[in-house]
């Protein structure tokens, strides 16, 4: 891999931290005073405190009845050298009821020079002497990677995957249309498959899509598969399966159908809840935040991957290291308290190789996500989070499922996505983001309309489950506040300096796609305040950050795929978002993605919503650059929507339905059915409903394979015409600043 990273340190200002090491060696003549010593021999220990350090307080073990203790214990603090760092040393006496301070002194850390090691004596109460040893070193490297470039592992994956893609294209398109493709050719297009959110509806629909793409050979031509919320649940199920890709989606989807056919109440048996609580307690006692999302994560994991709850995101590397499968990309949002996610949200991307935020160019290995950081250095490392924790975070909007099971109010059956998630939006998050306090405001609970025979079971199970969880966790706010339902992790950007930054794209001002006029960018798609604060930076002083379902801003994971470094030519997106009715226009989420792309100076084809008026509802729509010589970096988008059209009359492309049974099985609506079998918050799918949704999306995909193949051919031709497509040199990159939307130069970041 190249040793020079042209994007290094262009987002986070280059800075160093100091590692301050303290060894508490010993103390002599520890005393509680003449009268105190007559009553009791001291049980001494030492407490170290640096207010400016993130992990600020350390302590030694205590010795019983020992006036000359020898500790020889070493502690480390990561410090910002630009702050006035002072060490506070307190000699303590351990007691059964309340520990007693025997004296406090301070030490200015500035008196220790980098590279120096020295012993310093301290005197307490005129007779007690304590010896400490100090050393200071500069941390020249960090645990975070500061860059907008792809990591070396992804670059290596792309090289290996290219050979697989070439073979896939040759097999799918034929030798005539792929005769000049080779592993060194820039003609090989980068193809991405996208799946939207939408709960189990999205997961099941995407399972049918992936089966069609796998069996048709299209998946062999893709470099990336990106998902959001419900689609990530299917991707997690697929990529964590021990037999994938040897065993394809057909067999794995049968297992999925079986798993989602059960009532979620069965997950709340005493034995299972005891296991959940033990895991939550272990996490909380280790110093990690625990919220409602952690509980939901366990339930979604038990439903979908119950036989592999110990699997990690990094384990997926074995599925992609040789380029055998497309690289899976997952996402969630970082949001701020009391700010709508439509106004401000940072997209967080997850891959088996890295987790981070491209907006700031900060990334880390999956095993470090959730650890305590300061100035880019890990100060407390935890075990890598299990995959099911991420599944809960990626689909955290659906933590409302727990409220339903536990009888908490939510009368959202049959409502649109916007109505269903209104109470979960980050603009309602309560509390101080930087606080470590668990004190949270209370919300009143209500009741949910349900069948009478289910109400008794729900109420009784809910009461004891709540009592057990709250008794052990001691935190009723987990159930009763919106903040408790948002995921929360330690802020990995704590203490960093964001003075220098870039737009999401380093190609700003260089990309030649047609730009939207300013009034077009100001035009609202879903909300007058949408994206109002997307140029605002993350709060690097907050100790923790909130992370939520990306579908709360817009329901398609385009930000992952639009990173210029990935250079994607063809995007095949599948939108399972809720609509008011089956006949409603299907472009709202796509229009939001387009607006977000324009505001971040990223190439995106013009989305014309009037195509719906001209052509009506279709299974898929194509949006491409109008002039490839001008918009040479712009990808082509094939946008599939959730619609039951030709499937009603054909059981396979070109194969008509003949029997009454065949016709009746396909005669169903998605959003207009009064029974709402495909509701966003339906978490139990009978086999019949599963097969209907799965087979519908499999059919719609296969029915448009020729559309996909033609777009692939055109993408190869675009590459041949523009060999410099999506490339950028260091000389092209200009310095920019983060700014408010209403600043004078609105998009000159």
Swiss-Prot record:
Keyword Zinc found: no
Keywords on record: Calcium, Cytoplasm, Cytoplasmic vesicle, Hydrolase, Lipid degradation, Lipid metabolism, Metal-binding
Enzyme Commission designation: 3.1.1.4, 3.1.1.5
InterPro entries assigned: Acyl_Trfase/lysoPLipase (IPR016035), C2_cPLA2 (IPR041847), C2_dom (IPR000008), C2_domain_sf (IPR035892), LysoPLipase_cat_dom (IPR002642)
Active site, UniProt feature: 229, 549
Residue ranges annotated for the C2 domain, each copy included: 1-124
Catalysed conversion reaction: a 1,2-diacyl-sn-glycero-3-phosphocholine + H2O = a 1-acyl-sn-glycero-3-phosphocholine + a fatty acid + H(+); a 1-acyl-sn-glycero-3-phosphocholine + H2O = sn-glycerol 3-phosphocholine + a fatty acid + H(+)
Source taxon at top rank: Eukaryota
Domain PLA2c: 138-740
GO cellular component: cytoplasmic vesicle; cytosol; endoplasmic reticulum; Golgi apparatus; nucleus
Lineage: Eukaryota, Metazoa, Chordata, Craniata, Vertebrata
Cellular compartments annotated: Cytoplasm; Cytoplasmic vesicle
Protein name: Cytosolic phospholipase A2
Region entry Disordered, spans: 428-452, 729-749
Ways its activity is controlled: Stimulated by agonists such as ATP, EGF, thrombin and bradykinin as well as by cytosolic Ca(2+).
């Amino acid at each position: 891999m190249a040793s020079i990273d042209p994007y290094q340190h262009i987002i986070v200002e280059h800075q160093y931290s100091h590692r301050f090491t303290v060894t508490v060696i010993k103390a002599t003549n520890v005393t509680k005073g003449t009268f105190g010593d007559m009553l009791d021999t001291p049980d001494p220990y030492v407490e170290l405190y640096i207010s400016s350090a993130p992990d600020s307080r350390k302590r030694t073990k205590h010795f019983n009845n020992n006036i000359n203790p020898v500790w020889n214990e070493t502690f480390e603090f990561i410090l910002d050298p630009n702050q006035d760092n002072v060490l506070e040393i307190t000699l303590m006496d351990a007691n059964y009821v309340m520990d007693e301070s025997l004296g406090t002194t301070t030490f200015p850390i500035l008196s220790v020079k980098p590279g120096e090691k020295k012993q310093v004596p301290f005197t307490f109460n005129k007779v007690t002497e304590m010896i400490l040893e100090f050393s200071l070193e500069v941390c020249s490297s960090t645990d975070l990677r500061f860059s907008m470039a792809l990591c070396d592992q992804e670059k290596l994956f792309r090289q290996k995957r290219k050979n697989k893609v070439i073979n896939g294209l040759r097999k799918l398109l034929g030798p005539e249309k792929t005769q000049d493709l080779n592993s060194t050719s820039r003609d090989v297009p980068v193809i991405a498959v996208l799946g939207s959110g939408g709960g189990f509806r999205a997961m099941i629909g995407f399972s049918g899509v992936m089966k069609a793409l796998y069996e048709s050979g299209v998946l062999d031509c893709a470099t990336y598969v990106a998902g959001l919320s419900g689609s990530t649940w299917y991707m997690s199920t697929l990529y964590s399966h021990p037999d994938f890709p040897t065993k394809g989606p057909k067999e794995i989807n049968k297992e999925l159908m079986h798993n989602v056919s059960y009532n979620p109440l069965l997950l709340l048996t005493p034995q299972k809840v005891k296991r959940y609580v033990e895991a939550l307690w272990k996490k909380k006692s280790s110093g990690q935040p625990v919220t409602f999302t952690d509980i939901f994560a366990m339930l979604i994991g038990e439903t979908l991957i119950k036989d592999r709850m110990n699997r990690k995101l990094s384990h997926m590397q074995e599925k992609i290291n040789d380029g055998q499968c497309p690289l899976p990309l997952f996402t969630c949002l970082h949001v701020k308290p009391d700010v709508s996610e439509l106004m401000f949200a940072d997209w967080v991307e997850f891959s088996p190789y890295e987790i981070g935020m491209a907006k700031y160019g900060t990334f880390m290995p999956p095993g470090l996500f959730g650890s305590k950081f300061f100035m880019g250095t890990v100060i407390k490392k935890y075990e890598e989070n299990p995959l099911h924790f991420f599944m809960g975070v990626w689909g955290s909007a659906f933590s409302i499922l727990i409220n339903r099971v536990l009888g908490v109010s939510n009368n959202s059956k049959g409502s649109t996505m916007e109505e269903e998630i209104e109470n979960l939006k980050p603009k309602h998050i309560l509390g101080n983001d930087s606080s470590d306090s668990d004190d949270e405001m209370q919300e009143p609970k209500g009741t949910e309309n349900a069948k009478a025979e289910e109400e008794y079971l729900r109420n009784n199970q809910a009461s004891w489950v709540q009592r057990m969880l709250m008794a052990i966790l001691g935190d009723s706010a987990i159930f009763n506040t919106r903040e408790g339902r948002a995921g929360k992790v330690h802020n990995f950007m704590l203490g960093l300096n964001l003075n220098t930054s870039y737009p999401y794209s380093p190609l700003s001002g260089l990309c030649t796609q047609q730009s939207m006029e300013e009034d077009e960018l100001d035009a609202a798609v879903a909300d007058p305040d949408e994206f109002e604060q997307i140029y605002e930076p993350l709060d690097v002083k907050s100790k923790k950050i909130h992370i939520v379902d990306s579908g709360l801003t817009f329901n398609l994971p385009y930000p992952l795929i639009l990173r210029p470094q990935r250079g994607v030519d063809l995007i095949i997106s599948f939108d399972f978002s809720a609509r008011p009715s089956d006949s409603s226009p299907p472009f709202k989420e796509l229009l939001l993605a387009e607006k977000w792309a324009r505001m971040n100076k990223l190439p995106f084809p013009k989305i014309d919503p009037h195509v719906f008026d001209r052509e009506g509802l279709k299974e898929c729509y194509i949006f491409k650059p109008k002039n490839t010589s001008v918009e040479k970096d712009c990808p082509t988008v094939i946008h599939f929507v959730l619609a039951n059209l030709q499937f009603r009359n054909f059981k396979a492309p070109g194969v008509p339905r003949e029997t009454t049974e065949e016709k009746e099985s396909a005669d169903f609506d998605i959003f207009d059915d009064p029974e709402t079998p495909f509701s966003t918050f339906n978490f139990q799918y009978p086999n019949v409903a599963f097969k209907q949704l799965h087979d519908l999306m499999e059919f719609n995909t296969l029915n448009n394979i020729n559309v996909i193949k033609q777009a692939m051919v055109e993408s190869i031709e675009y590459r041949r015409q523009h060999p410099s497509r999506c490339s950028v040199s260091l000389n092209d990159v200009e310095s920019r600043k983060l700014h408010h939307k209403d600043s004078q130069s609105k998009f000159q970041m």
